[in-house]
Design a protein with these regions (language model features):
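AMP-binding/adenylate-forming catalytic core of the ANL superfamily
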Residues: 105, 260, 366, 371-372, ...
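Conserved ATP/PPi-binding loop(s) of AMP-dependent carboxylate-activating enzymes
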Residues: 336-340, 352-382, 418-420, 424
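Conserved AMP-binding/adenylation subdomain of ANL enzymes
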Residues: 192-209, 217-258, 273
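Conserved structural elements of the adenylate-forming
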Residues: 37-43, 149-153, 184-205, 267-271, ...
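Conserved beta-loop-beta connector loops within the AMP-binding
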Residues: 312, 344-363, 397-400, 470, ...
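Conserved AMP-binding/adenylate-forming core of the ANL superfamily
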Residues: 21-68, 72, 89-94, 147-148, ...
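Conserved pre-ATP/AMP-binding loop-to-beta segment of ANL
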Residues: 17-20, 130-173, 179-180, 200-209
Length: 516
């Protein structure tokens, strides 16, 4: 796969030039045809080639027509789009800008005003609205040419970058949930391989549209809801935020969205606010980023009438690793690996390979596995050996090829020599609170974290934003058969459980709250 992502997008858009490929629900349902999107991307790409000398370009835009055009223009021009996390705070964005050597950022005036003081600061800011007005005539010409010229001729005429293969195509910074963000380099080969793997899982379902509300700085938002539609996947219906379940329910119902990719946290909020009337038309729902609680899966099937398919991915995997297929799912697992990917489990301490069915640290090898962290050969060497990526997750592969994730290493505490999983305790507490009617908004309101303990090494701490009596919670956990060593002894009431824009729990912020 030596092809470039830019050429793949050009071909995918030119082939459907007269069809609507993006509906921007955040802009009143504006419908963007593939040819128009391609024309704007080609015009802006020419501008970037002329005026931006550096390789990487920062982008601060939400999901929508603007975000799609800015990212498309970068890959057409041979630039690396770096979608900056504008929700992570000044320190994290400054770190990303410094590591990537970003001098220019593409955004919009409204976006800068919304982000305010946390807006990433660079030498130069390009307003997308102004750029598109200035390049309007060229964009129209290119959109017309997209209707009449063969893709190869169009690419040659527009001087579209053909660099591909193992060259850098995207740069995503980890959420920083466990520390300073790391730059994950994704090559053209990585992204295109994962797109083909996604097609292999979902291509036969005849999906006409998917919801694109995950941030573009999130790996699923970047690959699944940005590049998949542009390279030939289903139409994407965009909304600028995943945090508004009421609006998202309206969007899903109004535009008859077929595919929803989200996190369990956001799905629970959506189920509570939208209901069957708006969500019942979905053909498939896939969750990732955190374990899907069995109670949520059952409740969604009962109330909405749709089976939730749990999947699994990571930024270093471009990101899709495994997913439960429609009609061939196994509850409690994340499904089978995507095509071309290998997995093995190893002992954490020795690195010894374990037998199939035995739980251990998961390692993956395949065309969608990243080549390394930006400017950090030390970190890269720790996690990549002979093409095998040493993940931070515990799991096991059964005899039928279904993968089960036991939890992230960062979500375990070593207490009295035993590894205690935070996620299992959270699942018990969330299920209990939900059935007791104490959960207010639909999102998870409990987080288990840990602080240092001189006697046992670590002490579990429960952060909760809803009413909870510690003694009552301890009794409930014991009645559910939770081992005594796993039962937390400290409970801290907080205003809200810290959650990242990606829908994951903010582990670093949680530890700070617990230690405070």
């Amino acid at each position: 796969m030596s092809e470039s992502l830019g050429i793949a997008c050009l071909r995918g858009l030119a082939r459907r030039a007269s069809r609507v490929v993006l509906v921007d629900a955040g802009m009143g349902g504006r419908k963007i045809k593939a040819g128009v999107l391609l024309g704007a991307g080609l015009a802006l790409a020419g501008r970037l080639r002329r005026e931006v000398s550096e390789r990487r370009v920062g982008i601060v835009l939400p999901p929508g027509a603007g975000g799609a055009i800015a990212n498309l223009a970068c890959v057409l021009a041979g630039k690396t789009p770096v979608n900056l996390n504008f929700t992570s705070g000044r320190a994290a964005s400054e770190s990303a800008i410094r590591q990537a050597g970003i001098r220019t950022v593409i955004s919009a005036k409204a976006m800068e005003e919304k982000v305010g003081e946390h807006f990433p600061q660079t030498e130069r800011k390009l307003d997308l609205g102004v750029l598109l007005k200035e390049e309007k005539r060229k964009a129209i010409v290119w959109s017309v040419l997209a209707l009449i010229l063969p893709a190869k001729v169009l690419a040659w005429a527009a001087n579209v970058s053909t660099a591909g293969g193992d060259d850098e195509a995207g740069l995503l910074f980890t959420s920083g949930s466990t520390g300073e963000p790391k730059g994950v380099v994704l090559t053209h080969r990585n992204i295109l391989a994962n797109l083909r793997q996604i097609d292999g899982v979902l291509g036969d379902l005849e999906l006409k549209s998917l919801l694109g509300c995950l941030p573009l700085f999130h790996s699923f938002g970047f690959t699944v809801t940005l590049w998949w539609p542009l390279t030939g996947g289903p139409q994407v219906v965009t909304y600028p935020s995943p945090l508004d379940p009421q609006a998202l329910g309206e969007v899903i119902g109004k535009y008859t969205v077929d595919l929803l990719v989200t996190t369990p946290t956001f799905l629970r909020m959506l189920m509570k606010r939208a209901g069957r009337e708006k969500l019942g038309g979905l053909k498939m729902v896939v969750t990732g980023a955190e374990k899907l609680p069995a109670a949520l899966r059952e409740e969604f099937a009962q109330k909405i009438g749709i089976t939730v398919h749990e999947g699994y991915g990571m930024t270093e995997g471009s990101p899709v690793i495994a997913v439960n297929r429609a009609g061939a799912e196994r509850a409690g697992t994340v499904g089978k690996l995507v095509e071309g990917l290998e997995v093995r489990t190893v002992e954490e301490e020795t690195g010894k390979e374990l037998n199939r069915g035995e739980a251990g640290i998961l390692e993956f090898r395949g065309p969608n596995i990243f080549p390394g962290y930006l400017g950090r050969p030390d970190l890269t060497e720790k996690v990549l050996q002979d093409g095998w990526y040493h993940s931070a997750d515990f799991g096991r592969l059964d005899e039928d090829g279904f993968l089960t994730i036991e939890g992230r290493r960062a979500r375990f505490s070593k207490i009295g020599g035993e590894m205690v999983p935070h996620g299992v305790i959270e699942e018990h507490l969330n299920e209990w609170l939900d059935r007791a009617g104490r959960v207010r908004g639909g999102g998870y309101e409990v987080m288990v974290t840990a602080v240092e303990d001189e006697r046992k090494g670590e002490m579990l701490v429960v952060l909760h934003s809803c009413p909870m009596d510690g003694i009552e919670a301890e009794r409930e956990l014991r009645e559910r058969g939770v081992p005594n060593l796993w039962i937390p002894k400290k409970f801290v009431r907080v205003g809200s459980v810290p959650i990242l824009a990606s829908g994951k729990l903010d582990l670093a912020a949680g530890r700070k709250l617990a230690g405070g």
